[in-house]
Amino acid sequence: MDRVVIVLSVLSVAASSQSILDQRRFSIAVSRVQHIHLLAQKYFSDFESSLQTEDQRQVNKIFLQDFCNSDDIISPIDKHDTQRSSVLKLLSISVRLIESWEFSSRFVTWSTFPRNQISHKLSELKTGIRMLIEANQDGAEVFSDSSTFQLAPYGNFYQSLGGDESLRRNYELLACFKKDMHKVETYLTVAKCRLSPEANCTL
């Protein structure tokens, strides 16, 4: 009987330690994506402010007719769908969104911020989320690497562009990047909240 109690105590301590570790990892991941999202908002705002009134009107009109490459990634359609999604699903979608930008982010004009640093920050964030996925996988729901896919690059943006076309593509990339980082921040925040039973995870 005493041996059973000891085993149960050890298992309880191990589970508690794992939960604390998960919370810490989630906190780091949320903090990192918040930083990236703030950068995305800043550079999108700076880019808009640098445009002439007519240029701003034109790129806005064009972008409304276009869509983000990552729209092909199946994700929750609204906040209620997000709240109903499992932690593992939210983490897996977040990885896919980040993967779609690891290469593309190198071709965005980031003002004074080095382009490769954004890509590096995304890679670090993806590594952290993958660790969370491994820690939260179980037999009931498994999202393996085979379920992920690489999106095609954003059109022909990597070719030499000039004039208005270059302006338009940079605007599109900044707008889509900001949108996708907002999604990742939301998904990670909800997933982190799920680890706290007493927390209110309402968006």
From Swiss-Prot:
Q: Where in the cell is it found?
A: Secreted
Query: Which GO terms of the cellular component aspect does the record hold?
Result: extracellular space
Q: Positions modified as Pyrrolidone carboxylic acid?
A: 18
Q: Which UniProt keywords apply?
A: Disulfide bond, Hormone, Metal-binding, Pyrrolidone carboxylic acid, Secreted, Signal, Zinc
User: Which residues are in coiled coils?
Assistant: none
Annotated Gene Ontology MF terms? growth hormone activity; growth hormone receptor binding; metal ion binding
Keyword Zinc listed? The answer is: yes
Q: What is the name of the protein in this document?
A: Somatotropin
Q: Which residues pair up as cystines? A: 68-176, 193-201
What PROSITE patterns is this protein classified in?
A: SOMATOTROPIN_1, SOMATOTROPIN_2
